[in-house]
Structure formats: structure tokens, C-alpha cells
Amino acid sequence: LPFVTNQPFKAKATEVVEPRNTMQQLKAKTLEMRTPQATKTAVLVIGGAEDKVHGREILRTFVARAGASKAYITIVPSASREPAIIGGRYIRLFEEMGAQKVEILDIREREQCENPEIKASLENCTGVFLTGGDQLRLCGVLADTPAMDLIRQRVRAGQLTLAGTSAGAAVMGHHMIAGGGSGETPNRSLVDMATGLGFIPEVIVDQHFHNRNRMGRLISAITAHPDRLGIGIDEDTCAVFERDGWLQVVGKGSVTIVDPTELTHTNEPHVSANEPLNVHNLRLHILSYGDRFHLYQRTVLPAVHRLPSYGDSYGDNVS
């Protein structure tokens, strides 16, 4: 399992805080949970349309995790029809955020993945950013190539922070949503599946999630693959997957978890493509900013939303 380590998760939402150090300890804990750690690699799965103008929190989190002022970021715009334009936009953004070096790997053909210069870039960079576009195009260019093997190896070794937005998010699982409909009753024809790049093989990711009414198609995908976990990510929202198995939500929207662990029945194997699916005992979580979910333990930790002000008595006015 690529994200499991022996190091325990530090933040405990139910930890008892002694009154004499209430403010100091709460502030320290919240700062630790909300401040990106420049030396701590992760996989950032972004629902698309991330903020590029105002706070840019998701992109800043990526740069911080990739090394902050020492970050060497490689942009892979292979999913896009206009890779030079899209890549150039992200170069400007990451340079403005203080990254030490930013470059584009404009890979349009599979043969390029064997280029020694591309290999050297991927061996030395600290962050890889997969842009949006068409997830089938991205997989067609990168899947089962030396370049992709190298990225996957370095991500699993904790040597590289990886981020993908929109189509770049869709490819994260082994099973990938390649297309389909939206806003309909779950049914087999609602979702088209393909093989992804398998960075987080346990999940099936859908993006632009509530913005494009994609709950039905994610449920349809999970019903066909009940050994996986469904992750639906809204626009300008990111699921940060840590190497210890926890994911944390960053951004303005929500992350929807569709968990079939306790599923007791579905008619999926027996109905035609357009017939409604029934799915019994499916578990659902809606996570927002700061909430955490453990990929393997299936446990949830709520966010610490606000510190009490200095005028509040201990325990009052905390939400």
C-alpha cells in the first residue's frame, strides 16, 4: 500500500487540552494542521478550476509541499490540447509563488518518455503537476512508460510531491472514470471506465463533482468496482493524500467519500445498461475544509474550525 507508513498520525481531534495552556496549545495544534509542510511530500488531487487569482491556497500548498523556495517543479500538460499555453500559465503562477525552478515537459508522444532529458528532469524535480484536459489523452501518452514508472517510484518513496487537477486528478486511481453523463439516476450506462495511472490504486476519482452533478456516475462506478473507494472532489477543492493513509481537505468546496465497505446488495450484475441500479448500505461522507479521512481505517476526523477569542471562557464559543 503506497501511502502506509509506521509513523502515527499526530493530530487527534479528541485530545484533552489542559486549561492552563488552552490558548497556546490550541493555537499550536491549529497552526500545525493548517500550515503546509515544505518537507512533507504528498499527492494532491484537485477537483479542477482551482483558484489562480486570489488566495491560490491549493497551488500554494502544492508549492510548499514540493519544497517552497527550493521547489523544482515539472509541469506535465499532456492532457491538454494546448499544452504550451496551459503549461506557460502554470509556470508564471509557480514562479510568482517563489518556486526555485519551474519547467514544462511537453510530452505529446509516447516515444518522448524515453528521452534522457525528460528522465533527468523527473529524477531531480521535487514536484510534478498534471494539468487538466482529457484523461484518456494523458493516459495514452504516459501509461506504461519509463517516465511514468519513474514518477510513480519517486512518489511511493516519498521523494516527490504529485498534484493533478481535473483530468490530472481523474487518472490517480487504477480504475478511472473516462467520461459519462451527469444528473441522472445511477445506472451502468452513466459512466465510462478505463485504466488510470494507479498512483492511488484504491480509489476512483471524479472531479468538478457537485458543480457538474456527478454523484450518480460516481455511485455507478463504485457499484461496478465495490473493492474501491469513491472520491468526488468539487472545483477549487483538493484532497491532500498523506503517506500515512490520511487525506485532508483544502479549498472552498467539499470532498465526497463513497464507501462500499459495508455494501450488502446491488443488482448491478443482473440489469441492463440503462436500468436503475439499487445499492444497499452504501456509506457516504461529505468532508469540507480541514476534515480528514483515513483511506484504510475508514475513520473521519473533523476540522478544528475556529479558536476561541481571548474574551471567551474556556470551552465557550468554539465551533
Residue ranges and their predicted role:
Residues 8, 19, 25:
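Cationic, low-complexity basic patches in intrinsically disordered or flexible, solvent-exposed regions
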Residues 74-78:
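Short internal beta-strands
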Residues 80-124, 130, 137:
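Portal/gating segments that form or line small-molecule/metal binding sites
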Residues 131, 137-215:
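Class I SAM-dependent methyltransferase SAM-binding "motif I" and its flanking Rossmann-like core
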